[in-house]
Amino acid sequence: MKIGLFGGTFDPIHIGHMILMENVINNLDLDKIYVLPNSNPPHKLENKKTALNLRLKMVNETIKDNPKLEINDYDYRDNEIHYTFDTINYFKKTYPNDEFFFIMGEDSFLDIEKWKNYKEILKENLIIFKRYSNKNFSLISKINQVRKYNKNIYLIDNIALDISSTLIRNLVKENKSIRYLVNDEVINIIKEEKLYVWFF
């Protein structure tokens, strides 16, 4: 099978994540995407995060009706820090008959030299989603450089609106509507658990 790996804190998961994953599945004909909620992402160790069980609940409620999306517990099962290089290797060794594609944003790709074992990551199947920003020239230039020794880099337009988890948290904090930005089940969880009122 062709399987995408999409990690994130998903705090909360939102319609932008869903549109992106659907777009990736359609463009690369993936059989499945493993959604990988992070317990301790190495680039966000100092950031406040909603409790993992609540983030998982929001992800599950959002993706449960899509058979091509599946939560995988690798990045949170042991509460350890998992680097991308280790994550990709784990799936390749555990499922040797499957082909894996790591999904990342343009900002992450442009800063990939800061990642552990980044040269090895650049040899893998990478799906990069771009935003409509002033970074597009730098992004295309970098992709062309990497493609000299790895042809398996795919650039996908992010057709979703400019939605982020930060935007949603700020709207909640300001007591503004997030309807249509997340699904109704996520809205209910946020209200019931009084999430994001403490973000600053």
Task: Identify the role of each PLM range.
Residues 1-200:
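Nucleotidyltransferase catalytic core that binds NTPs
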